[in-house]
Amino acid sequence: MPCHRDEIPAHDICAALATEFKMPCTCSTGFHVEHASKDDLQTVLDTTAELIDALKKHVARVMRATWDEADEVLAVHEDGSVIGPVDRIKAHAGEGVLHQAFETFLVEGTGDDARLLLCRRSALKRLWGGVLSDSCAGHPEVGEELAAGAARRLQEECGLTSEQAPLNQLGHIVYREDHGDGNCECEWCAVFAAHVDAGALRVNEQEISEVRPVRLGEIDAYLAGHPEPLAPWTRLALEDADIRAKLVELCQE
């Protein structure tokens, strides 16, 4: 980072980011610029502010794909009634704690041209990273309705507003699936779907590494593991006869 003094603005960038994300600043560096005018210094300061802002946004996007120890999810009974908040890590450890979740299927086109947009989860994901799944999944925040949480995550992961992706609830599934590393998914999972215009997605690459349009006629092969298996909650939703029928109906509209 070019600077008038070695510690400015390189140190300021590191200090700002360390403060924002509560992490230690290990080092910073810069090099001296001879005969810098007032305008030159102002340009450097303005550019530094822009860089800090851009880095904050980028790191925030990456951190959304990880788990904060302070994160909570909503524990529920088998019928979906809420018990109360539970630590997210605890909810996914060992036998798990049944908690609220949602998944959303996005559809492009109608009739014979309809395509289900399956998305590959980023390798950054703690559970089932790199696996093909529904278009977007997540957990509602404490005090947030399921549909509102699904709309929020569509904005964060796919860049879609609620107007671009009006949600229809298709049903729900209740399941538990071991991840094989001492963690699991144990969810009461609402299933949503929405029609979107072709090319509307603006994916967050820290969340999604691939968008794959799939014809409804290809779904059974994916459920059998060909050409590859789906995330367990995606497979279970598509195996549910009522959910599948409502999804097919939506594709015809």
What are these regions (language model features)?
Residues 1-22:
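Short, internal acidic amphipathic alpha-helical interface segments
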Residues 20, 26, 31-64:
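Phosphate/ribose-phosphate-bearing ligand recognition and processing surfaces
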Residues 66, 130, 173-253:
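Nudix hydrolase/Nudix homology domain
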Residues 66-111:
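Acidic, metal-coordinating catalytic segment for phosphate/diphosphate chemistry
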Residues 89-101, 112-156:
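Conserved Nudix-box catalytic region and its N-terminal flanking loop in Nudix hydrolases
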Residues 161-171:
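A short coil-to-beta-strand element that immediately follows conserved catalytic motifs
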